[in-house]
Amino acid sequence: MPRHLHPSRKTFARFASRQPFQFGLPNVSPELAQASDNSPVYFTRTNSLLRQQVLGNAKGVAIKSDAFRFQVLPRDCWGKADFSKSSVLFLIPDDALGDCVGMTLFLRAFLQRYPHAKTAVLNSAAASDIFALIPDLAIFQLFISARNLAQFEYVIDLSEMEGWKDIATMPVNPEEALCEAFELAPVPLEKRDVSFKPGINIGIVPMASSPLRTLPPELVGKISTLFARHDANVTIVLNAYQGVMKAYKAALGDLAAPNIRIVDGFKTIGDLVQFVSKQDYMVVADSGPAHITKLFQTPGLGIYSSASAKTLQGRHQNLRSWQSGFVGPYCQAPCGLAKLRATPDGKIGCMGSLNVAASVLSELPQKSDPALARTLVTENPVPCVAELGQKSDAILSLLKTELSLDS
């Protein structure tokens, strides 16, 4: 084990089990499920689903500690170490799809530089299917045994990358930040040309995890109708795991064209990844699927509101971008907020929707407000999202020009 280590930022639960066990998340491909291996102890993040909902009530399980920290290689050593024949375990900070796509792209660059390194990820959780696109990468979606941990010479906490602490208020590009930190050249990109023809497969993914980044239903309906009128096969993919999905689907109305279908969502992230890989063109909100297009260089249009398209797309030019141009008395797009925030007296929103300065919105909401979320995505969107709807004609014109469509 190398010297000059320090504790990981996040704490892990250290537990033992007298009985064999296996565990897999419902939205992850079954083949990535994990099983015990008779190790004396195991480790999982203290805030993971496994720790919070399973271990505390499981027979034969003993929690040894909830304050365990791995000894990890410090950030200032990442670019100096030689990983040529090393075994490296990367701790994944969270399972947000966009961030994990960036980390997957970084791992491609890492293995391009160190093809004989043995690599693994821990805490990939719901994003495990994304990491599974890398051949021979070991994936520990929720826990690792002491036996497996002992195989790794280096443990690296990726939350030490620049900008991670502030990612909730100012998005970063993990691929760019990590390649710079490890002094790696990113993998070359293959260009996929846009070629419209009847029968083309077009995927539209309008929903993000936040109302700040979800596209107006009326805009999505207009885009879908445009493509359908030119004999494209259009699939609108919603997210059944989000509480606002039914309301959003109702707001789309009756898209009667036979070549438009609406999918409530996919069972696993692996199914979503496969869907993106098979599309000829995509229209996406600032969401995980927008980032997944980078893995296949799928061409399309990314429509952005609160986050910067330039920051999120980085070097990837497969998506043409449209950025909300909203300017108001308290903010202008892109403001950098990834999620709704709360005022000290509990009002939930953003600077534009609440007409307050950014300094007033210092906290994330302590509890969800489903009714507010439904209103924001269907009836009264935040100003930067509403501006996208107001510019629908210009967005349609851009699509017509790029895909050489007549009116």
Regions found by a protein language model. Name each.
Residues 2-407:
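Catalytic machinery of carbohydrate-active enzymes
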